[in-house]
Amino acid sequence: MKKADIGLVGLAVMGENLVMNMESKGFTVAVYNRTVEKVDAFTGGRAAGKNIVGTHSLEELAAALERPRKVFLMVKAGAAVDGMIEKLLGVLEPGDVIIDGGNSHFPDTIRRTKLVEEKGLLYVGTGVSGGEEGALKGPSMMPGGSPAAWPVVKPIFQAICAKVEDGSPCCDWVGENGAGHFVKMVHNGIEYGDMQLICESYQLMRDLLGMTDAEMHEVFAGWNKTELDSYLIEITRDILAHEDADGSPLVEKILDTAGQKGTGKWTGIESLEEGIPLTLIAEAVYSRSLSAVKEERVAASKVLSGPAVSFDGDREQMLADLEKALFASKIVSYAQGYSLLRSAAKTHGWKLRFGDIALMWRGGCIIRSVFLGDIKKAFDKDPELQNLMLDDYFKDQLETAQAGWRRVIAAAVMNGIPVPAMAAALSYFDGYRSERLPANLLQAQRDYFGAHNYERVDRPRGEFFHTNWTGEGGSTSASTYNA
């Protein structure tokens, strides 16, 4: 019997769909699940008659695979991955490849790569984006780990991943150890930002402009034919047209509390570790946290007053402004995300190809959009681009959008409608383009209470000074206390 090209462990929906995807591309797949009944149900059901081999133990799985053996883990991130790696190390041999396709935290992937390589095996931590449908029809894939593993898994990965219009695969090698899962983490953070920006646009249409769901559906349908063309705009269009059993808009029946799995939080924490302002994505995470305290908000709505919502302007002009505000804010979100990627690449020694990452996100994933092609062009033109907003195309788009962007946020503020992500985006834009910020006063405060020193505008950078602000503190500066 022909040996299988690859094995997969974990037959939840994502795992099953990846198996079906691989088999449809001509690969024979061996499968294993901790509860073996799941294996039999799968091979006797939707996998019946296909080149899919069921196994009831990891030993049987390993024996069914051609060398070098490749085992794709689709198990819950965390301890389950560590446990499965430990078991696989007992049945695999040097040169074999273990692949983790879950949403693992990148420090875990760095640790696991080292562990597996020390045993003589190879390790791949790959981000997989696109949900259940993407897994079946072609996801975006972001692999990192042991560089020697890439030639081994590349034929399978690039066969099953999504493709863009010219046939280019939405999968390429990202970098060593945890690079792939780091890029997937930032992808998810940007996803949080995109979703929040769309929700703020929806709230402004509904609460400020008094639009019906049918009218908003038409607006999003129109936007999906512009530079905002994207998967998330597309599904928002469809959601707004979906009716409940009684014929009313279903979305208005859904409780306004949003969940999260933690990848957005990881992105925000990592931005703090790297010292990179990721303000929009952080606000998107906090907005979900605020939505979760529904009972508190209901109580507060009866106590805390705000302005009466009133709009007597030109609705079409406001919608045009809102389109520009959404696009400009989206540019800022990606600019911040790419700044984090650039900083982390230096910290971890990853040689990230930023334009290629944009291409990986062009198809198959949740943030796929036409816009990503412009990011690819920006980094192809200048691989050392410091900030996406400085690219000629994006600079021009921000300048065109700026007046409408400001009008939208001003209208939201005056009417008491929260737009935390859009407002954070504009504040970042204004801060980034400011030659002078009030941090001189902040540093003076730090020197006053903590003797933390400061630099002077009339002296070379790197030369530090301390002032005895009270006449009692002396001339000693701080070395251990920091604030």
Regions found by a protein language model. Name each.
Residues 81-86, 99, 105-217, 225-249, ...:
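Rossmann-fold dinucleotide-binding core
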Residues 53-60, 77-85:
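Glycine-rich, highly charged phosphate/nucleotide-binding loops
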Residues 222, 346-378:
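Small-residue-rich helix-loop
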Residues 399, 404-483:
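C-terminal amphipathic alpha-helical interaction region
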Residues 181, 206, 211, 226-331, ...:
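Interdomain hinge/lid region at the active-site interface
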Residues 1-69, 92-95, 131-135:
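NAD(P)+-binding Rossmann beta1-loop-alpha1 motif at the extreme N-terminus of oxidoreductases
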